[in-house]
Structure formats: C-alpha cells, structure tokens
Amino acid sequence: MLLRSFRTVELLRRISTSSVSGYRTSPSLLQRCNGFQSYLPHRVTTTESPFPSHISRFCSSQSANSQNENRHTTLSSPVSSRRVNNRKISRRRKAGKSLSISPAADAVDLALDSVVKIFTVSTSPSYFLPWQNKSQRESMGSGFVISGRKIITNAHVVADHSFVLVRKHGSSIKHRAEVQAVGHECDLAILVVDSEVFWEGMNALELGDIPFLQEAVAVVGYPQGGDNISVTKGVVSRVEPTQYVHGATQLMAIQIDAAINPGNSGGPAIMGNKVAGVAFQNLSGAENIGYIIPTPVIKHFINGVEECGKYIGFCSMGVSCQPMENGELRSGFQMSSEMTGVLVSKINPLSDAHKILKKDDVLLAFDGVPIANDGTVPFRNRERITFDHLVSMKKPDETALVKVLREGKEHEFSITLRPLQPLVPVHQFDQLPSYYIFAGFVFVPLTQPYLHEYGEDWYNTSPRTLCHRALKDLPKKAGQQLVIVSQVLMDDINTGYERLAELQVNKVNGVEVNNLRHLCQLIENCNTEKLRIDLDDESRVIVLNYQSAKIATSLILKRHRIASAISSDLLIEQNLETELASCSAV
C-alpha cells in the first residue's frame, strides 16, 4: 500500500517533531518537502504546567491505518440522569455549509459538564542506560466524558504516565484517574475514575459523523494561557489521511482553522450537539491550522477496547506499492486503457498477503472499490483519499477482497488483514526497555527511541548501519528483534573489546540470535569453556572464558550500581520457563 506499507515506518518517522518528546526530525524528508519544512505537523501537547522551571516538560506527537465509520455505533447514553439538551441545529450538509448561528455557545453549554482538565506526571526511560529512568515531568491536557463513565483523551497526554489526576469544570478538587487503554498509533486513551463525587452532574458527549468542508466546529479544552475552560471556533478545511506525529502513523484526520494550542490535546471538537473529533496536533509555523481525530478512528479504538479488553491496533495489508500514473508503465504490465491501479513492489513476510500476492502484481480494486493510478479511492463529495484508509477501517482478522492483474490476467483474492509491527519498533511508550548485561557488554534490542537518544539530528548522528536497518529492514519471522551491543562497561574481562559497541549481534556459539530473550538463553545455558559472539555480519568476534565472565559480571554490576543484569520482562519470562521445566520434571 502507498501510505500504510511497512516503508511508512521510514517515511512517517521523518516528519518534523522538534516539539515532540522523544522524537527527532529527519532532514531527508524536509528536503523532499520543497521548502515547506516549517509547516509540518506537530503534536499539540499539554500546557506548560506551573511547576518549577527546572523540571523537564512533557511534549506531545508511522506505519498505520484508518477505519469504516458505518460499522460502529454511536456512544450516546449519559453518565448521570441529567440530559444534554438536544438543540435543533439545521445544516445544509449537501452543500457542505453550516447554518449554525453560534457553535461556540452551543459547545460551551455542552462542555461545562463534560470536559475535564487532566494533570499527568510521567517518567520516560533512558535507552542508553536502560536500567534507569529520566527525571519526572509534569504536564496538563484535556479530556471529555463519553458513555460508560469513561474519559477520552490523547495518548500523548498520558504517555509514560506514573500518576494521573482529573478535575472537572467549576471544581477545585482533583480526582485520581486510571488509564484503562492506550492506542499510541491513533493517539487516543481511555481514563476511568472511581470517585462517585466526580461523576455527580457529569454528562456524556455523543460521537457524531465526519463533518463536511466548511462546517463549523468549536474546540473545547484547557490550553495554555489560563486555568479555566476555553472555546475556540473554526471551520473544517480538509479531510484526509495525515501524519499522526505521536504514534508515527498515517490515519484519517480533519484539518480545521480553529486555534489548537498546547493543553487543548484531548479536548473535543463539537459540531452542533455532538463530538466531531478530538484535538491532537497543529502545524508549527502556521497560524490557526490544527488537526482533530475524526469519529471513525475514535469509534474503531473504543470498539476494539470494548470487544477485546485492550487496544488492538489498526490493520495493514503489508504491501508497498508504486503509483502507475505513467502510461508506458501501465502498458508494460498489460493494463488496458480502462484499467487503473497500483504496482506491488514489496510484501511484508509476516503478512497474509505474502502468501497470496506477488511482486509486480497490479492492485486494481479493494473490496470492490476501484483504485486509481495514484493510489486513491472515491470519498464523498468528489473528494479522494488513499486506499490505505479502507484497509485501516477493517477489524483485525477481517478479510478483504482484492482484485489483481497478474501477467495480463485478472484474479480475485481474499486476504486477512491484521496489525503488523516493524522489525525495529517506532515507539515504546508505557514500557521499560529490555536489556541484558554479561561481562560488561550491554545487549539491547534496537528501537527508534534508542536512536533518538543521539539527539535532534538522530537520522545523521546515530550509527549509519543501525539507522539504515531500523528504517529499511523487515522482520522475517514472528518475534524477531535486531539485538545490538549498546555499550561496553569496562573491566579486565573485556579489555580490547571496548570499541565493539553499536554493532548487531548475529550469533552466539554458532547459533543465530532471534531476539534478546533468545540471546539471554544462549548465554545463560552455555555449556562450553569458551563463549563466542559474532557481531556485525560476522566481521567482528568476541571470545570469553565463560566462567570468568560470569564472575566478572557480578563485580561490574556492583561497580556501576546496577541492580540486575537482566531486565524485569526477561527475568519474568525466564522464571516462568524455569517453573514450567520444574513442573515437567516432576
């Protein structure tokens, strides 16, 4: 697919994210943007909080999908017995114009008992020192109540959270909130509050439809510049798949000309008496150009959580496609003058499409919808969007019917769609990094957050080989990780090996390494006198006396005040395997 492919991991990670905590800009995309780098999307973050200035602030921000609004039900039941007044607001939807006289006034009436202010304390891990966390940060954002006593906000508002409080309008009391579910790809989260006092007088907002162009919306929230609720109004100017900066994702978004500022994140955009979307990011360097997450994406997220009990992600077909706008290109693949489509150039080995499609197939239609030569499909009122939107609208494990031209003959195949993960994770919020230390060698799985530790210009300053593999390589089997030597903690046992850092681990005692857990098992279960580790396409080798290395590991950990040689996630898995083995032996 053009935008939802595994190559999106590269393309979408390169968006300007100078205001985003943990994300860095890649200049190669800025060069392709023909001078428009100052107008790239930024995650609208939470406001600067009134905490001491020395405390670092939380700043909010590719491979992804969108969804089908016709499959989802609206969430309309109120939290309390108080009812939201249903106002009769007429609209000429066919013309795409709003006749609502005062959308801001209507939004205020709805928001007073629905929109809340969110206070978050968060702590991010250090990827260079994975056994440590960075300093604590405080931030603020917005959210609103939906049916079922739930609060919707942005994922970046509560990312890496350690403590969350909410406060409703007109109250001085903050209530403890728990994060029930987070979808970082779609930048959405669900909070729950146990306090009965909090829910007194609160009303649930109802999710509406995608607004048409030029329809009026009002964004409600708690942006910087004050402590009370704020309402800004504007009109819809564009509806199309957009870069979701926080999740490095491509999903449908709505562009509006209402001011969306830090602190607005998670607040509702209200159209009439329903929610049209959730405010989440804006364009740096541009005035009053903001983006809201549309209701189909919100409903997909909520429905997935309700059905599966957790966030399930957005589907991908797992293909990378080339536009076929050139006539000679179409002729070369035996396309008739009436045919349109896109050319399959790469296929993710872990996708269902890998077993069905072939390189140089031409995708003609998806679920009966013709695909144009530029990869777009029709979308209401003569608008067009990329066909990735249709793919991401599917539920996990749902099938799609694709029409394919192969060697001049048309075929139809049924393909199962599911969320796909890249070989190198694009983000790792709300979890501690994995690591394993042996003989002073710090082994970690390569992630893009690790590369971001190299600074703002990480695309150029991080190790070139690792950066290339992070953006280009595809997983060949499930559970595969790219394991590297992050650094070498100096000791007599590793003298002479101190420069063998930032290299990939390929083999341990001749066995190819699948992931960090596998490497840990290979080393811990070594039964030979010598331990051999092959690095970087077997061009570098480490040989250690195994028993001496085990003794040295304990001394190195004590010297560097490291509590454990193995991260908690690997330790838990290792203990479980030991318990299972003991049970089997009994």
Curated annotation (Swiss-Prot):
The keyword Ubl conjugation belongs to this UniProt entry's keyword annotation: no
Transit peptide, residue positions per record: 1-22
GO BP terms in the entry: proteolysis
EC number, UniProt record: 3.4.21.-
Catalytic residue list: 156, 187, 265
Domain PDZ: 318-398
Key word Protease present: yes
Matches recorded under InterPro entries: DEGP_PDZ (IPR041517), DEGP_PDZ_sf (IPR046449), PDZ (IPR001478), PDZ_sf (IPR036034), Peptidase_S1_PA (IPR009003), Peptidase_S1_PA_chymotrypsin (IPR043504), Peptidase_S1C (IPR001940)
Residue ranges, compositional bias (Basic residues): 84-96
Keywords assigned by UniProt, alphabetized: Hydrolase, Mitochondrion, Protease, Serine protease, Transit peptide
PANTHER family linked: PROTEASE DO-LIKE 10, MITOCHONDRIAL-RELATED, PTHR45980
Protein name: Protease Do-like 10, mitochondrial
Native organism: Arabidopsis thaliana (Mouse-ear cress)
